[in-house]
Amino acid sequence: MSDLYCVFGNPIAHSKSPAIHAAFAVQTAQDLRYEARLAALDGFGLAIAEFVAVGGKGANVTVPFKEEAYRLATRLSDRAARAGAVNTLVFDGPEVFGDNTDGAGLVRDITNNLGFSLVGKRILLLGAGGASRGVIAPLLAEKPASLIIANRSADKAVALAQAFADMAPLGGGSFAETAGKSFDLVINATSASLSGASLPLPPGIFAPGSLAYDMMYGKGETPFLTLARQQGAARCADGLGMLVEQAAEAFFVWRGIRPGTAQVLAELRAKLVA
């Protein structure tokens, strides 16, 4: 019988993960099934128990359950412990192993797919929520020159910077406090693009040759990327590649095989803009 995997979320009907993992399974000749499962907002633990009871081997976790998955895990990877959130679970008897592949997915998309080295770069990370926390350690591992966190409420950005101060001296402050500085990479980890909102970014933050990266994606250009282009970003990229790369990393955690991502990403992109 095929090994069973799934993604938990609420909502979840929009998820591209089943199609991505089905493509990975075919490509790597792995015998598995992967489905989307809706968990009640107050019933994530029960949904996990029911899935394990029917033979579930592992699961991805998306909004709004990543922090709850972190608390539910009996063992954590270093990157999940750092992130304070879990997006990948492995079920092995009574043990629940929690991992976080978001940061690895982001870094691999930027460095491999986009060919943009992070070594020695000045990085601005917009947002101080869970999406930002999950990617800071993997970004710092690439040895950038600096990493500054900016947020609407400066105190949250400062607190997040302090949480990773043992890894590198990070900066934290408000969006307005980035005025007069320029960056090689600006990453939008806020949810502003979901609501169609634009961020109050001061002009001049995009250095020559800079990359603007939005973790969100959609049929058209996100408001952040439109603003970035207007303000002089040399290159713009959305988060579809990050989605595929974090899925590939989760597939590797489960199966020990790293699938290729180029064709899967190209097919998803074609469907998105069709």
Curated annotation (Swiss-Prot):
Protein name (database record): Shikimate dehydrogenase (NADP(+))
Positions annotated to bind NADP(+): D78, G127, A128, G129, G130, A131, M215, G239
InterPro entries the record matches: Aminoacid_DH-like_N_sf, NAD(P)-bd_dom_sf, SDH_C, Shikimate_DH, Shikimate_DH-bd_N, Shikimate_DH_fam, Shikm_DH/Glu-tRNA_Rdtase
HAMAP family, sorted: Shikimate_DH_AroE
Biological role stated in the UniProt entry: Involved in the biosynthesis of the chorismate, which leads to the biosynthesis of aromatic amino acids. Catalyzes the reversible NADPH linked reduction of 3-dehydroshikimate (DHSA) to yield shikimate (SA).
Keywords: Amino-acid biosynthesis, Aromatic amino acid biosynthesis, NADP, Oxidoreductase
CDD domains given in the database record: NAD_bind_Shikimate_DH
Designated gene of the protein: aroE
Keyword Oxidoreductase (UniProt): yes
Catalytic residues in the record: K66
GO terms of biological process kind: amino acid biosynthetic process; aromatic amino acid family biosynthetic process; chorismate biosynthetic process; shikimate metabolic process
Catalytic reactions on record: shikimate + NADP(+) = 3-dehydroshikimate + NADPH + H(+)
Chain residues that bind shikimate: S15, K16, S17, T62, N87, D102, Y217
One Pfam family, short name: Shikimate_DH
Quaternary structure (record): Homodimer.
Any one Gene Ontology cellular component term annotated for this protein: cytosol
NCBIfam families attached to this UniProt entry: aroE, PRK00258.1-2
Keyword Oxidoreductase: yes
Top EC class for this record: oxidoreductase
Record GO terms (molecular function): NADP binding; shikimate 3-dehydrogenase (NADP+) activity
Pathway annotation from the record: Metabolic intermediate biosynthesis; chorismate biosynthesis; chorismate from D-erythrose 4-phosphate and phosphoenolpyruvate: step 4/7
Organism: Dechloromonas aromatica (strain RCB)
Record EC number: 1.1.1.25
Similarity annotation: Belongs to the shikimate dehydrogenase family.
